[in-house]
Amino acid sequence: MRIMGLDFGERTIGVAVSDAMLLTAQGVKTIRRSPKELEELKTMLQDYEVDHIVLGYPKNMNGTLGPRAQATEEFAQILKEEFGLPVTLWDERLSTMGAQRSLLEADVSRAKRKQVIDKMAAVFILQGYLDYIRQKNGQNKE
């Protein structure tokens, strides 16, 4: 069993996948939004044997939902209908900022950061979810 994390944006979708033990999230790629995006996601779902999707849910800092949240809810419904997998909406506040900070600390160039930021945001979203389920299940051995 693996879980896929998605950072759904206006122009791109960042993709991350968990390891088989559900401990860590790895960035896979950034998909350009297009009519073929679902085909590309389907291929990755099959290749990585994914059985659950975690979709970043864009809340405002005060917890309210903005216009992007509605688009994300609609995309979640499309994913459920298209792939027949459970889709969890996961609070993505600060995921992009965290990804940017990590890339800056790693001294990644501006051009390279732009290429990988959505994939890294998907990693932050998925890792947050993985940490949550591990803690919820009492498997946090820190």
UniProtKB/Swiss-Prot annotation:
Major localization class: cytoplasm
Q: Which SUPFAM superfamilies match?
A: Ribonuclease H-like
The yes or no answer to whether the keyword Transmembrane is present is: no
Q: Where in the cell is it found?
A: Cytoplasm
CDD domains (UniProt xref): YqgF
Q: Select a single GO molecular function from the record's annotations and give it.
A: nuclease activity
Return the GO cellular component terms, semicolon-separated: cytosol
Q: Which UniProt keywords apply?
A: Cytoplasm, Hydrolase, Nuclease, Ribosome biogenesis
Q: Which domain of life is it from?
A: Bacteria
Similarity comment: family membership: Belongs to the YqgF nuclease family.
Q: Give a short account of what the protein does.
A: Could be a nuclease involved in processing of the 5'-end of pre-16S rRNA.
Any idea what this protein is called?
Putative pre-16S rRNA nuclease
Lineage of source species: Bacteria, Bacillati, Bacillota, Clostridia, Eubacteriales
